Amino acid sequence: LIAVVYRYDPPGRKKEFRPWDAKRRKMAPPEPRPLFNQPGLVAAETVVLTEGEKCAQALIGVGVVATTAMHGANAPVDKTDWTPLQGKAVLVWPDRDKPGWEYAMSAAQALLTVGAASCDVLLPPDDKPDGWDAADAISEGFDIQGFIASGPRMCIKPLNTVRSQEATVWATDDALA
């Protein structure tokens, strides 16, 4: 046991999360923050990264290998241990909202930095409501396997792979190509 995240959904209030660090034996997130479902990640070639434990658990419940960072879209990407996803094909399934998209983009770069084999961000359908997520998809009978296999997606490349044109521009004596 690395950590536990207690989720509370008090009536009429925002959901609350309270992490427990098993090693330090206190109510605080561990450093670095572990990914959810680590035993399930070990043998997987492809993993779906969601925005929270509820969505990851819903996907696991229908046979999809899934994980999430502690605190979902509010996760400090730089404090998360992404190394269990090295060498894996990762599909990021964001919630259909601005925080979900921003989290997907920053998590994708972190994944590529630690050596994920590939990283694609699934594009939620345009006709779904704001905030729609993997758990909603499952509850409404959405074709999860079809969406994961061939749904619209954006292939993410590392930011540092932009080729500089400096060598080609300055390779001549007068700097005019």
Positions of predicted regions on the chain:
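Short N-terminal or domain-adjacent regulatory/targeting segments
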Residues: 19-33
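The Walker A/P-loop phosphate-binding site
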Residues: 155-177
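TOPRIM fold recognition
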Residues: 2, 11-12, 23-26, 43-47, ...
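Short capping micro-motif at the N-terminus of alpha-helices
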Residues: 3-5, 30
